[in-house]
């Protein structure tokens, strides 16, 4: 993959075709493979097989999994949540997302649950993207300050454009 590749999300919903897509993270960094999630089983497999990684992404995948399940069987809310919860029993964001979805959807008529499940999953995705962007914005300011400090403290032959920072990233980078 190019270091200058365009920015992508790791999960997204395509209104055209009514489908959920993920980047298969087991293939990174050697290949960029897009997988379409069409069923609850697909969402469960993506979580279990670690095709999606990172706590927020696992929770968002589960939320879309509930939507996919309800599309196929409008009566499946509780069983879908149970199956998804079993994929990673210790994943806090997974349990949190499923609790949020269950609480919101149980209060609705079955006929309204499908559209609401999609809206909730998309809102979780948007909220997480905003949080990650804020993390990036804060981190950028810190990195700029560190680079400036490094440029000022190094001998002249190593400063300026030749100064660099070595960065190791984790999770939400």
Predicted regions and their residues:
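Short, well-ordered beta-to-alpha junction loops that form the rim of enzyme active sites
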Residues: 62, 169-173
């Amino acid at each position: 993959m190019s270091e200058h590749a365009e920015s992508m999300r790791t999960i997204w919903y395509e209104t055209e075709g009514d489908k959920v897509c993920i980047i298969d993270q087991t293939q990174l960094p050697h290949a960029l493979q897009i997988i379409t999630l069409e069923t609850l089983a697909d969402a469960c497999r993506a979580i279990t097989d670690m095709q999606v990684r990172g706590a927020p992404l696992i929770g968002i995948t589960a939320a879309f999994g509930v939507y996919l399940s309800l599309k196929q069987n409008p009566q499946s809310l509780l069983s879908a949540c149970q199956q998804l919860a079993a994929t990673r029993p210790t994943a806090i964001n997974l349990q949190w997302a499923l609790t949020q979805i269950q609480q919101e959807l149980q209060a609705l008529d079955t006929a309204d649950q499908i559209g609401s499940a999609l809206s909730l999953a998309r809102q979780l995705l948007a909220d997480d993207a905003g949080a990650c962007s804020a993390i990036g914005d804060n981190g950028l300011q810190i990195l700029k300050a560190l680079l400036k400090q490094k440029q000022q403290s190094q001998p002249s032959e190593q400063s300026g454009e030749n100064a660099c920072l070595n960065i190791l990233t984790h999770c939400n980078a």
